[in-house]
Design a protein with these regions (language model features):
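Bacterial N-terminal Sec-type targeting sequences
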Residues: 1-126, 130-139
Length: 139
């Protein structure tokens, strides 16, 4: 190239930049998920500790706190199992009725086999049916 670097060096630099952008996406997604969860937990803990609240409201706040804790554990398990299947990174978002999983792609798009592997993991960990599971590739 004009600056004296080889085409190989340019390509690897672009690859590094793309890898950094994907890594940044996953780090940012995890941070946003945690900040959102921390905010919700703070409000729920306040509600559970409110002396003026009726018992039903306190019980509901405590149930939601337990659900958030369970979702957190399930997300971590899904992420670890997906990465154990050979994917470089992923982030899972679990709620009561659905799960979304974002996978670091290879640039070739998700294949049916990729979707099947991840769907099987999510179904096993959550008991949800495939129609409640969304799998996508980070670009």
């Amino acid at each position: 190239t004009a600056d004296g670097s080889s085409l190989e060096e340019d390509a690897s630099g672009e690859d590094q930049e793309a890898f950094g952008a994907k890594k940044n996406y996953f780090d940012t997604a995890r941070l946003n998920r945690q900040e959102s969860r921390d905010s919700a937990l703070s409000l729920l803990k306040e509600a559970a500790a409110d002396e003026k609240a009726d018992q039903a409201a306190i019980d509901e706040a405590n149930r939601e706190i337990q659900q958030i804790a369970q979702n957190t554990t399930t997300e971590a398990t899904i992420e670890n199992l997906v990465m154990a299947k050979g994917y470089s990174d992923c982030v899972a978002f679990v709620n009561k009725e659905s799960v979304s999983v974002v996978i670091a792609g290879t640039g070739e798009g998700l294949q049916n086999s990729d979707i099947a592997k991840v769907t099987d993991i999510v179904m096993e960990e959550t008991g949800l049916t495939a129609d409640k599971i969304k799998i996508m590739e980070a670009n």
